[in-house]
Amino acid sequence: LLQGLMRNDYQIIILPEPVESEELYCTRWGEEHLLFSLPPAHPLSGSKGLHLSDMDGETMLLFSQIGFWKRIPSEKMKSSHFLVQKESYDFEELIRHSALPYFSSDLAVRQQGTIPNRIFIPILDPEANITYYFVTKKQSRNRFSALLERIRKQNAS
């Protein structure tokens, strides 16, 4: 993404880490926090928060296109079995019609809403939280001033 920004393929990019460069402007854009989605009958569904280790060993649904989040299940839940779905339609059908746990995030819940008969529980491990950064060329910063002001206000609240 950074190379594309420098080649002018992109005007802005969002990254999961800050960038320091004389040519680039970088500011905090927002955060995302992973959640476990559990059916009400699950033994841990009453928890206020869970660690990845609490769910290690479970069979869970997992969507394949989760980007950098993919390392968490493979590194932190080695005893779990993941039923990996490549098609979003298949994944959506399974999460609506099965009792298997799956990962979600606060951003996904805000954008797509909650699913009936599901309880969303925050994951307490630090790696289940990410800060995103807005990056553009310094010379383009004025072009995005309205958007940057909106980001600033959002982060202040």
Show the residue positions of the predicted features.
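Hydrophobic residues within well-ordered alpha-helices
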Residues: 4-6, 55, 93-99, 134
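A ligand-binding cleft/hinge motif common to bilobed small-molecule-binding domains
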Residues: 14-22, 71-75, 89-121, 125-126
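Short beta-strand-to-loop elements that line the ligand-binding cleft
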Residues: 16, 62-63, 79-90
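Flexible hinge/capping segments at coil-to-helix
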Residues: 22, 26-34, 38-60, 145
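Residues embedded in well-ordered beta-strands
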Residues: 35-37, 43, 101, 119, ...
